[in-house]
């Protein structure tokens, strides 16, 4: 690995903090149309590994690994339990955690949305509706105002294609829907949210000093039968939906998905061009 390669660890609030009340905690309690539980054996996150209370111990473990960075997400549902109401005690908690990281020479990398959001936002329609984007932007502004003086690396949204496909195509993530067109709309709205947040935060105090990026995982989809034309068409379509549409949008300002009979969407926003300081 090159000398400048960054080694670190990463978590998501819902996966480690415990006692979250959000779209995922609600989904964990639900059942599918056939009556089967959404989660195998009705497992629920519960207190998880209690990172909320045990973060000082966890940070010591990170330090023992001799890595330099820790990416974590802040839990929107805890920071803003009701629309328009921010919990100062929760904001203070994350502030102490950031200070502890810095004291241990670990660089904090803050993620603003990692799969979860408040139930009140879910009831508004979440990212199914473009008009809800300003609500997310407002949350991001408040968090950025609190921590931008100490946090230099910011991730807007974690893996938007996962949220869109697993939540709205396969139905394996909340809200458990299976609608390919809606999946494309949600992906478009998540990317629109990223672009808006990027530009708003860049105009705030410290905005030009920090780096703001999007977290995108790349999954390669190969044809089942390499000799079969239809399999190639399917794999190419899935690759474009999951990977290329996001990359193209940030390079050209054009978001385009065209899968006959499944999803058809075209959106242009030139503000998206280069609206990321890093991508990964």
Residues of each region from the PLM?
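Catalytic domains of carbohydrate-active enzymes, especially glycoside hydrolases
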Residues: 54-75, 107, 274, 278
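Glycine-rich, proline-tolerant flexible connector loops at the mouths of alpha/beta enzymes
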Residues: 74-88
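Active-site region of glycoside hydrolase catalytic domains
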Residues: 1-39, 83, 91-280
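Short, flexible active-site loop motifs that bind/organize anionic cofactors or intermediates
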Residues: 45, 52, 81-84, 126
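A common structural microfeature
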Residues: 4-6, 52, 69
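Aromatic- and Gly/Pro-rich amphipathic surface segment
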Residues: 25-60, 65
């Amino acid at each position: 690995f090159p000398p400048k390669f960054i080694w670190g660890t990463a978590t998501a609030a819902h996966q480690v903090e415990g006692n979250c009340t959000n779209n995922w905690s609600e989904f964990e309690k639900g059942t599918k149309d056939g009556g089967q539980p959404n989660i195998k054996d009705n497992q629920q996150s519960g207190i998880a590994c209690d990172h909320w209370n045990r973060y000082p111990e966890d940070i010591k473990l990170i330090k023992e690994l001799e890595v330099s960075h820790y990416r974590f997400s802040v839990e929107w549902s805890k920071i803003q339990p009701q629309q328009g109401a921010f919990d100062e005690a929760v904001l203070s908690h994350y502030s102490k955690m950031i200070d502890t990281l810095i004291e241990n020479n670990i660089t904090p990398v803050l993620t603003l949305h990692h799969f979860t959001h408040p139930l009140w936002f879910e009831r508004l329609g979440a990212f199914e509706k473009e008009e809800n984007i300003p609500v997310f932007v407002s949350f991001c502004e408040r968090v950025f105002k609190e921590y931008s003086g100490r946090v230099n690396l910011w991730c807007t949204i974690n893996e938007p294609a996962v949220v869109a496909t697993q939540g709205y195509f396969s139905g394996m993530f909340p809200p458990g829907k299976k609608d390919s067109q809606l999946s494309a709309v949600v992906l478009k709205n998540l990317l629109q949210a990223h672009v808006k947040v990027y530009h708003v935060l860049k105009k705030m105090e410290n905005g030009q000093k920090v780096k703001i990026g999007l977290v995108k995982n790349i999954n390669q989809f190969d044809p089942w039968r390499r000799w079969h034309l239809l399999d190639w068409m399917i794999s190419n379509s899935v690759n474009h939906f999951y990977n290329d549409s996001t990359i193209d949008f940030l390079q050209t300002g054009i978001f385009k998905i065209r899968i006959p009979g499944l999803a058809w969407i075209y959106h242009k926003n030139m503000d998206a061009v280069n609206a990321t300081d890093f991508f990964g």
